[in-house]
Each structure stands twice: as C-alpha cells, then as structure tokens.
Amino acid sequence: MKILIISQYFYPENLRINDLVFSLKKRGHQIEVLTGKPNYPKGDYFKDYSWEGPIEEEIKGIKVHRANLILRKKGGGLRLFLNYFSFVFFGLFKILKLKNNFEKVFIYAPSPITVGILGVIAAKKFNCKSYLWVHDLWPESVRVAGGIKSGIILGLVNQMTKLIYR
C-alpha cells in the first residue's frame, strides 16, 4: 500500500512516529514522509540540516520530503506559533508537488493539531482516506494548558479542529 505520512517531526528527531514508519516499511508498504527540518526539542537545526537543505532525502529506504519552517529557538509563544504555522505553509507547497498517487494519508499530531490541515489537503488531492494520530485534543488543550481566554481565538481554533477531526 502507498502511504503518505505527515508529521512535523521525524527521524533523526526521536519520536514514536519513527517506530511506526519503519515498521510499516518492513511490512512491505511503500512509505513517503512529509516532515519539517529536524529541530526538536532544542528549536535549532540538527547537524547537516539548514534552511537550504536537504529538501529531499532517503532514510532506510523511505523517501522523505522536508519542508522549511521557522525555528522556534528559545523564543516564546510567538516563535512557537510561527514554527507550527510555517510548517503548514511550506508543507502545502510540498503536497502540491507530490506526484505519487497515495492510497492512505496518515497524520501524526503530537501537538499542534495544525499539521492536520496538511492531512485534509493531501487526502483531497489523492482522493483517499486520512487517519489522524492526535495526542492533544484541541481546542480544549489550548484553552486549559495554553491559558487562552479570547473567545475569538478559541472560536477560530474550534472551527479549524472541526475541519481536521471530520
């Protein structure tokens, strides 16, 4: 089966999605990953990565498409916001360029749920089902953990999550 995995984070970053991706590959699935440039958890590029590249690479037989993103570095909430949304912005261009006709789209969203936007777009483009592995339930986690009280912001987040969870 041809599967597109979308995750802001992927190898060499150390997250659970790596285990799933490599396991699916071992089971004979054709896997491609759309991800960001590795920078988690410190918020700065890993060795051998930069804004310039690599943009495409192969890791253990898996084609990896790397989207640029704004690094969060040691900045506060604004830098984190820019990091999340820049991955969605640059990831959108990557999806538009993808040629493979995927049968499934799998979205890994430890946080934020914004990566789900790319999954919705990819599933529509490839006319296939998408699956979402979410860790934080938005918008509730934004209100409680994020301390956001603005009705306007929470309303926008609520509309975005309804689109993604659908």
Label every model-predicted segment.
Residues T35-I95:
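A conserved catalytic-core segment of Leloir-type glycosyltransferases
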Residues N14, F81-L92, K104-C128, L132-H135, ...:
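An aromatic- and histidine-rich active-site surface loop
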Residues G75-R79, V142-G147:
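Short acidic, glycine/proline-rich loop/turn micro-motifs
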Residues T114, I121-F126, I152-R166:
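Membrane-proximal helix-turn-helix segments that form the acceptor-binding/catalytic region
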Residues K97-F102:
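Glycine-rich phosphate-binding loop signature in dinucleotide/nucleotide-binding domains
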Residues M1-K60:
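N-terminal subdomain of nucleotide-sugar transferases
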Residues F10, P38, L71, P112, ...:
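Short, glycine/serine-rich, charged loops/turns that create anion-binding
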Residues L4, E32-L34, H65, F106, ...:
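Hydrophobic/aromatic beta-strand patches that form the interior of the parallel beta-sheet core
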